[in-house]
Every structure is written in structure tokens, then in C-alpha cells.
UniProtKB/Swiss-Prot annotation:
Keyword Magnesium in annotation: no
GO cellular component terms listed in the entry, alphabetical order: extracellular region; membrane; other organism cell membrane
SUBUNIT field: Monomer, or heterodimer with alpha-cobratoxin (AC P01391); disulfide-linked.
The species this protein was found in: Naja kaouthia
Protein name per its UniProtKB record: Cytotoxin 3
Residues carrying a glycan: N29
CDD domains the record matches: TFP_snake_toxin
Length: 60
């Protein structure tokens, strides 16, 4: 699986066990992701942070 880094022009290949790509947004500003990468399980959203997870190459 390949996931985009913070700047979508760059990406990385996920290590074994990390089978999801994610992007994280601040709830107050959903237009600009603050973090992207590989993850093993999608975190729960909170009052401040929203996560979007997916499982295809460079989907984040």
C-alpha cells in the first residue's frame, strides 16, 4: 500500500501491518489536512480532530 505524505506529491510505501492510509483534519478547518500517512487502525474522531481512512494506493 502506498500512502500520500503531507504534501501529496510525495508518498511512502507502508510497512507490514499498516494497511490503511489516513488524513487528519482539525475540525475547525476541514480544508487543510494537518497529517497524512500509514496507520494500522482508523482512530476515532474527537471534538477537535477528524480522521479519514481508506485502503487503496494514494487514496488519502
Amino acid at each position: 500500500l502506498k500512502c500520500n505524505k503531507l504534501i501529496p506529491l510525495a508518498y511512502k510505501t507502508c510497512p507490514a501491518g499498516k494497511n490503511l492510509c489516513y488524513k487528519m483534519f482539525m475540525v475547525s478547518n476541514k480544508t487543510v489536512p494537518v497529517k497524512r500517512g500509514c496507520i494500522d487502525a482508523c482512530p476515532k474522531n474527537s471534538l477537535l480532530v477528524k480522521y479519514v481512512c481508506c485502503n487503496t494506493d494514494r487514496c488519502n
